[in-house]
Amino acid sequence: SIPTDATLDLDEQISQLMQCKPLSEQQVRALCEKAKEILMDESNVQPVKSPVTICGDIHGQFHDLAELFRIGGMCPDTNYLFMGDYVDRGYYSVETVTLLVGLKVRYPQRITILRGNHESRQITQVYGFYDECLRKYGNANVWKYFTDLFDYLPLTALVESEIFCLHGGLSPSIETLDNIRNFDRVQEVPHGGPMCDLLWSDPDDRCGWGISPRGAGYTFGQDISNQFNHSNSLKLISRAHQLVMDGYNWAHEAKGGTIFSAPNYCYRCGNMASILEVDDCRNHTFIQFEPAPRRGEPDVTRRTPDYFL
């Protein structure tokens, strides 16, 4: 575990971040180095114990992440599992991702952070994180530290051997969790193939595999979910990646759930957000929340394309 002076240092950084104040470039660099050491030891299918609170996309909506912690409890009092998409689109990607990585370094056993499709060099150059780093630091170094770190994030997690958690969805190239365990994940998100599918695919009402309108990943039907759950002794697939107006929805006869944790997404969608609490007995409860009160959003024009709205 971390020596006391380092711990005090980190605690100070976390409380600074909780006030939505970014760290210095040097602090971010050191933090990412420590985080990399921790993440290197985690599996592509990272085991997680209950009780745990499972969260979906945050997308740089820092004040709503603070609201999530207010409702769900602060780390380390509550164990958390975040399913990716910390950056892009919102105005505070830097503060959001730095806080989550800071919590990971401080409480590695209490928080699990997975990779989303936005935790990629290519996507962040289009949807805002790269530009935000330039604006806040005057150069791209912080963007580079984080995007290098993103390559080490686990792709999926398994809660108590029965709830399979990941950002996007299933892949026609993956039949078992062991298939996923055998990937080399330390790379930029590929344009196709199984690793890409885990971060990009979506459940669908139609059976079988379908072409995804997103241009990456696949759509998959209830028959596919059932087969995967059966082959891997799973009760539930929990994922994020899609805006849902109630903050959550069930698909595939409650064998699959979507969790979205960015309320009033892009500051204009009017949706609720939710988190999923899994207790010691593995009962699960969705908790909905609304946006945190806004105190003067920066006036940033939206020039980024909306690839799914």
Curated annotation (Swiss-Prot):
State the family named in the UniProt similarity comment for this chain.
Belongs to the PPP phosphatase family. PP-2A subfamily.
* MF GO annotations: metal ion binding; protein serine/threonine phosphatase activity
What is the active site of this protein? Answer: H118 (proton donor)
Q: What class of enzyme is it?
A: hydrolase
Q: What is this protein called?
A: Serine/threonine-protein phosphatase PP2A catalytic subunit
Cystines in this chain = none
Which Enzyme Commission number(s) are on file for it?
3.1.3.16
Q: Which reactions is this enzyme annotated as catalysing? A: O-phospho-L-seryl-[protein] + H2O = L-seryl-[protein] + phosphate; O-phospho-L-threonyl-[protein] + H2O = L-threonyl-[protein] + phosphate
Q: Where does Mn(2+) 1 bind?
A: D57, H59, D85
Question: Which keywords appear in this protein's UniProt record, sorted alphabetically?
Answer: Hydrolase, Manganese, Metal-binding, Protein phosphatase
* Binding-site residues for Mn(2+) 2, renumbered to this chain: D85, N117, H167, H241
> Which organism encodes this protein?
Brassica napus
**Comment on bound cofactor:** Binds 2 manganese ions per subunit.
- Which cofactors go with this protein? Mn(2+)
